[in-house]
């Protein structure tokens, strides 16, 4: 059996980020054992990012971390930020924005579903409202207002003005539309596509809508796309989330907001993974950065954070970047079994610690893989 070595750059980041990256690396080490599919080895390279990097080097993304990421098969990130670093000139979040831009991670993929039906009762919405919710948000990640021209208050002549310009090009919208279409076509039948914008107000949204229509009609005629204003979609997501089941495609800022809104539907931010991709995963080898949806949670006690979002991010990495589809399925099943067994952290009304949940998932995925040998 041949050995495939995958190099993973690990960027713990700040606060709980330093804890949660230990659990997926533990689980991936468990998967290293021979399986009926292939022999895998992981080579983990740890580097600083965010506030920890600022404290150590003065910058939120040191050159060695960026170079390691560029030379790796994938990047696993914890979380960045915290009140210690405030909103000063040098901020932890700048490291995240820079690595996205430098690695051309133009598409952020965030699912919103229930890892197990046993979690339905934990949703802040009624179980009968959220049951069956299964949507994937495809967010454009390196364009729009976050990367547009800007003027800070202190840069204006009267010190009373600050602005950003939300800008999109046809090429930027075209490639994110193709990503959404690819994701839709991975299902049989293909999933519907919802495009969220503010075309009744913003010129950039009108270009967005026109381009999405053109790409879908000319390149993917078998797919359907419906347009929804972002404010209306935000209401629908709470009133009737299953209506938006399918693929949601939207711009950088709108995606930032709507994906966070969607992330609370399953009951905890600690459940949902995220992948930021630099290319279509059409050969299951798309380079990307994988991270949980939640932030650095600086107020959370040690060993109390839910590691499942980060572990499922590693599962996405196995599927999309490393061509380990069977291992991904085994890991997702292991997460479901552990949740159903009642081994849960406090955010899921459990009493288990971060490491206990990680240990249980590592042990369970090992058993599942051995059963298939």
UniProtKB/Swiss-Prot annotation:
Substrate binds at residues 100, 110, 139, 231. PROSITE patterns: IDH_IMDH (PS00470). Its main location: cytoplasm. NAD(+) binds at residues 82-93, 295-306. One of its GO terms (biological process) is L-leucine biosynthetic process. SUPFAM superfamilies: Isocitrate/Isopropylmalate dehydrogenase-like (SSF53659). It catalyses: (2R,3S)-3-isopropylmalate + NAD(+) = 4-methyl-2-oxopentanoate + CO2 + NADH. Its EC number is 1.1.1.85. It is found in: Cytoplasm. It is an enzyme of class 1 (oxidoreductase). InterPro entries: IsoCit/isopropylmalate_DH_CS, IsoPropMal-DH-like_dom, Isopropylmalate_DH. The record marks 146, 198 as: Important for catalysis. Its cofactor is Mg(2+); Mn(2+). It comes from the Eukaryota. GO terms for molecular function: 3-isopropylmalate dehydrogenase activity; magnesium ion binding; NAD binding. Mg(2+) binds at residues 231, 256, 260. Pathway: Amino-acid biosynthesis; L-leucine biosynthesis; L-leucine from 3-methyl-2-oxobutanoate: step 3/4. Binds 1 Mg(2+) or Mn(2+) ion per subunit. Keywords: Amino-acid biosynthesis, Branched-chain amino acid biosynthesis, Cytoplasm, Leucine biosynthesis, Magnesium, Manganese, Metal-binding, NAD, Oxidoreductase. GO terms for cellular component: cytosol. Catalyzes the oxidation of 3-carboxy-2-hydroxy-4-methylpentanoate (3-isopropylmalate) to 3-carboxy-4-methyl-2-oxopentanoate. The product decarboxylates to 4-methyl-2 oxopentanoate. Belongs to the isocitrate and isopropylmalate dehydrogenases family. Homodimer. This is 3-isopropylmalate dehydrogenase. The gene is LEU2.
């Amino acid at each position: 059996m041949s050995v495939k070595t995958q190099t993973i750059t690990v960027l713990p980041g700040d606060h709980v980020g330093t804890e949660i990256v230990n659990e997926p690396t533990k689980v991936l080490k468990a998967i290293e054992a021979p399986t009926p599919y292939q022999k895998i080895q992981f080579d983990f390279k740890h580097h600083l990012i965010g506030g920890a990097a600022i404290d150590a080097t003065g910058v939120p993304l040191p050159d060695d971390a960026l170079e390691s990421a560029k030379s790796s098969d994938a990047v696993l990130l914890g979380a960045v930020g915290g009140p210690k670093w405030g909103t000063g000139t040098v901020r932890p979040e700048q490291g995240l924005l820079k690595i996205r831009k430098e690695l051309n991670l133009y598409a952020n993929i965030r699912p919103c579903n229930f890892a197990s039906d046993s979690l339905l009762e934990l949703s802040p919405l009624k179980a009968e409202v959220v049951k069956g919710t299964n949507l994937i948000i495809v967010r454009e990640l390196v364009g729009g207002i976050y990367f547009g021209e800007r003027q800070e208050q202190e840069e204006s002549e009267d010190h009373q003005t600050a602005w950003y310009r939300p800008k999109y090009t046809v090429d930027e919208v075209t490639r994110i539309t193709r990503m959404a279409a690819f994701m839709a076509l991975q299902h049989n039948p293909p999933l519907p596509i919802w495009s969220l914008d503010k075309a009744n107000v913003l010129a950039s949204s009108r270009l967005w809508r026109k381009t999405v229509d053109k790409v879908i009609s000319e390149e993917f005629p078998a797919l359907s796309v419906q347009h929804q204003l972002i404010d209306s979609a935000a209401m629908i997501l709470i009133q009737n989330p299953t209506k938006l089941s399918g693929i949601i495609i939207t711009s950088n800022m709108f995606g930032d907001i709507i994906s966070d809104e969607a992330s609370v539907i399953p009951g905890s931010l600690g459940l949902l993974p995220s992948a930021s991709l630099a290319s279509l995963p059409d050969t299951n080898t798309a380079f990307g950065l994988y991270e949980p949806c939640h932030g650095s949670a600086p107020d959370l006690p040690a060993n109390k954070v839910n590691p499942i979002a980060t572990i499922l991010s590693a599962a996405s990495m196995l599927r999309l970047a490393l061509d380990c589809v069977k291992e991904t399925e085994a890991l997702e099943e292991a997460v479901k079994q552990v949740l159903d067994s009642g081994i849960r952290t406090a955010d899921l009304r459990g009493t288990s610690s971060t490491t206990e949940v990680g240990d249980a998932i590592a042990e369970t995925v090992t058993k599942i893989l051995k059963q298939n040998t």
